A protein has these predicted regions:
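Helix-loop element at the rim of GNAT/NAT acetyltransferase active sites that forms part
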Residues: 11, 16-33
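Terminal substrate-recognition subdomain of acyl/acetyltransferases
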Residues: 82-83, 117, 140, 146-161
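Conserved beta-strand-loop-alpha-helix junction that forms the acyl-donor binding cleft
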Residues: 89, 115-125, 143-145
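Conserved acetyl-CoA-binding loop-helix of GNAT-fold acetyltransferases
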Residues: 90-105, 126-131
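Conserved GNAT acetyl-CoA-binding A-motif
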Residues: 105-118
Length: 161
C-alpha cells in the first residue's frame, strides 16, 4: 500500500467511500445525499492543506484530508479527517493514514493537531487516536445524532507534534 497526494482523477474512487460513510451516519456530520460535485469540496483540500489516498494495486482503500484547524492566529494547529473503505476497515489503513498525517503536519510546521468532533461511540477511532498520543480534552454532550444510539457526545481530541 502506498499513500500519495490525491489527484483530481482519484475523486471517482474516493466518492463512493465518502458517500457510504456519510450515509451510514455514524462518524461525520457532513450533509447526506450529496452528489459527487456537491461532496467534492467537503473532502478535497486546497493548499495549505492536502488530501491523500491509500492505494493498493491501483485501488483506493482510504483517504485523509489535513490542514490548518483555524485560519490566522489559530493556523499553527492542524486538523484532519479520515475515510477507510468499510470493506477494508480493520486492516491498518486508518493507522497508516494517521501516521502519514502526523508526519506531514510536523513537516508542514504545525505545533499540534486537534480533532474537533470524534463521535464518542466510534470506539475504534477513539482507541486509534489515543494509541497515537491523542488525549480527549473535552466532550460536547449530545451533539451528534447517531442513527441507532440517538444523541451522543463529540470528543475534542488533541496532541502536540
Amino acid at each position: 500500500m502506498i499513500i500519495r497526494q490525491a489527484a483530481a482523477q482519484d475523486w471517482p474512487q474516493i466518492y463512493p467511500i465518502y458517500a457510504a460513510i456519510i450515509a451510514a451516519g455514524e462518524t461525520y456530520a457532513f450533509p447526506e445525499g450529496q452528489s459527487p460535485d456537491e461532496a467534492r469540496p467537503w473532502w478535497m483540500e486546497e493548499p495549505p492543506g492536502q488530501t491523500v489516498v491509500a492505494e493498493s494495486d491501483g485501488v483506493i482503500a482510504g483517504s485523509a484530508k489535513m490542514g490548518p484547524n483555524r485560519p490566522g492566529r489559530g493556523s499553527h494547529v492542524a486538523t484532519a479527517s479520515f475515510l477507510v473503505d468499510p470493506a477494508r476497515q480493520g486492516q491498518g489503513i486508518g493507522r497508516a493514514l494517521a501516521e502519514y498525517t502526523l508526519d506531514w503536519c510536523r513537516q508542514a510546521g504545525f505545533a499540534s493537531i486537534q480533532f474537533n468532533a470524534v463521535v464518542e461511540s466510534n470506539a475504534p477511532a477513539v482507541h486509534l487516536w489515543q494509541s497515537l498520543g491523542f488525549r480527549i480534552i473535552g466532550t460536547v454532550p449530545e451533539s451528534f445524532d447517531h442513527p441507532r444510539r440517538g444523541l451522543v457526545g463529540l470528543h475534542v481530541m488533541f496532541r502536540y507534534l
